Amino acid sequence: MLPTAWLLLGIDDLIRAMPNEGLEDGTLLHIGETGQVDVGPGWRDLEASWYMGVAAIVSSGTGVIVDEVFLGGRKSQERLRTAFGGLAVLWVGVTCDSEVARAREALRPDRVPGMAEHQVAIVHEGVVYDMTIDTSHASPESCAVTILSQMSTTT
């Protein structure tokens, strides 16, 4: 759908790139039994380096779709906005019905039950989007078409 090849980079890629010991012992990232996510010492430094790397990729001329979860709401967006400096960004908020989110979560073996419900309450707090898209009943393709049409009017 995109006119050139783009990269998809997201929070799950960052987590996979982190040292196992910081994930296993919870010192970098801890996911509670109810799905609450807490970050430990060192997370922000690694996150900042990741963001700077993504910004460098975009600065080199490669398009990137960033799949991020703003666990800190507005503060999380500000960290990413700062790293991206003057780069052109289309901020897209992705939402879905809580029942749909629970069903999708159940299909993912890497998710703790309740994680989606916990996160939906915090990830959009104070975040400013150029557009939002509800994926509850829309296909990924139709969502992509909607986003692409917005990209063509803003770039």
Listing of model-derived features with the role each one plays in the protein:
Residues 8, 63-64, 130:
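Hydrophobic "anchor" residues on beta-strands that sit immediately upstream
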Residues 37-87:
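Glycine-rich phosphate-binding loop used to anchor ATP phosphates in small-molecule kinases
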